[in-house]
Amino acid sequence: MGNHKAALTKQVFTFASELYAYGVREVVISPGSRSTPLALAFEAHPNIKTWIHPDERSAAFFAVGLIKGSERPVAILCTSGTATANYTPAIAESQISRIPLIVLTSDRPHELRSVGAPQAINQVNMFNNYVSYEFDMPIADDSKETIDAIYYQMQIASQYLYGPHKGPIHFNLPFRDPLTPDLNATELLTSEMKILPHYQKSIDASALRHILNKKKGLIIVGDMQHQEVDQILTYSTIYDLPILADPLSHLRKFDHPNVICTYDLLFRSGLDLNVDFVIRVGKPVISKKLNQWLKKTDAFQILVQNNDKIDVFPIAPDISYEISANDFFRSLMEDTRVNRVSWLEKWQCIEKKGRKEIKCYLEQATDESAFVGELIKKTSEKDALFISNSMPIRDVDNLLLNKNIDVYANRGANGIDGIVSTALGMAVHKRITLLIGDLSFYHDMNGLLMSKLNNIQMNIVLLNNDGGGIFSYLPQKESATDYFERLFGTPTGLDFEYTAKLYQFDFKRFNSVSEFKNATLLSETSTIYELITNREDNFKQHQILYQKLSEMIHDTL
């Protein structure tokens, strides 16, 4: 028994030290018995911060938020059995978004698998469709090979924690009773750093010259890292190219004349210009209308993504590059300048008129877009916005016009799962205000526990239209009128003031835009600001905006 304890201690302390060596500074633990050895190892490590969350689904999304905020890999740990399956939604989001989430599932020893033992399900390869790498670790013993396996496997897995290959990885770790390591053996816990992987690629600019010398070009930028925007702006300025900037591109922070923000409303309103080439950068954009245009345009399409797996949605490009945006545009700086002044000015003119129409609309509107517009005004440059999927991200796409704030969202799988938890994870590292609808909020109310337990400050702006507002914009609204409210509207009638009390948030309710205009978003306390809206009225007022912009496009072109 003494040998078992020594072997277990060496295994889990070495594993914790190797995670630290490859950049892990935070671990989110969901309590359980089988995970005891690793949980104690992480708690004993002097340079690893542990977070405790009893809900595995919310815990995993909280870790996703920590990664977004710190730009470092984060590990999650749970016990064996069905607890592990609750990680699946966050792992799926991480896979599509290229987030280096390290999934650690504790398991029963091999002799207790498939024999009816409690809390034992098949955990080997259980996330096979969503992880970049996975390994079923050997059980602790006295052999050198068992410890070597940790070194080898972490070295292999590290390529998925940094660079273009980023994504979630899964280690399944079986533990045999007794489960308690020797906590006095702290000399086995080390804080040495490994040399992290570095990736660099170049392109042959001459191969693109015949395309980029054409006059009518666009740069379309989706979700991407802050540090990749500099060369995009420089290239756009030198070569007179409009930039259609998604709200997650971090380009709308800049008051730059080439940054176009109103394109979703413009394309929705009938804008259809002939274009010679498009340079698509980063992940796919949020705008459905822009994606539809990309599918039908005859323009030559170049895709630039710093990933090992290129996301071609909405349509496969003519050519793609696995390279950072900075490296791509830097390599093109020697090209001959093309006179595109009239082309750029046309876009700038349309953008200016579009912004004017939006401003006039917001001065009169009383719908959700008016609330969102006010929130954007109230958000200081010290704060960032985390935006829920469904209608909130679409309204922000339409209404965020060049303000120096960062915007974040879970746009991998685009689901409403785990939004509260992800935002709270980010709030550990940044000042965050969360904009979310009532159904998305209900879906992850458990996530609020992390704020209560750890005193994490975050404001939540809750758009409450008592149901799923986005369905009012879909064909189901007209084709299934008798069943629409029950199947799609899904009103809940919940009073979220009780939620605020349960998790010790302050609570303020606003029944009109005018009330909200006079409100102050406090940064010292966590507050839920509930904004009461009406789905039908919201739909009708949005149609008015679309019509005004359609008339403007018709008159301009």
Swiss-Prot record:
Keywords, ordered alphabetically: Magnesium, Manganese, Menaquinone biosynthesis, Metal-binding, Thiamine pyrophosphate, Transferase
BP term (GO), one: menaquinone biosynthetic process
EC annotation from Swiss-Prot or TrEMBL: 2.2.1.9
Stored Gene3D superfamilies: 3.40.50.970, TPP-binding domain
Endpoints of the signal sequence: none
Superkingdom field: Bacteria
Presence of the UniProt keyword Metal-binding in the record: yes
Free-text remark on how the cofactor is bound: Binds 1 thiamine pyrophosphate per subunit.
InterPro entries associated with the record: MenaQ_synth_MenD, MenD_middle, THDP-binding, Thiamin_PyroP_enz_TPP-bd_dom, TPP_enzyme_TPP-bd
Cofactor(s) for this UniProt protein: Mg(2+); Mn(2+); thiamine diphosphate
Family per record: Belongs to the TPP enzyme family. MenD subfamily.
Free-text function comment from the UniProt entry: Catalyzes the thiamine diphosphate-dependent decarboxylation of 2-oxoglutarate and the subsequent addition of the resulting succinic semialdehyde-thiamine pyrophosphate anion to isochorismate to yield 2-succinyl-5-enolpyruvyl-6-hydroxy-3-cyclohexene-1-carboxylate (SEPHCHC).
Protein name: 2-succinyl-5-enolpyruvyl-6-hydroxy-3-cyclohexene-1-carboxylate synthase
Gene assigned in the entry: menD
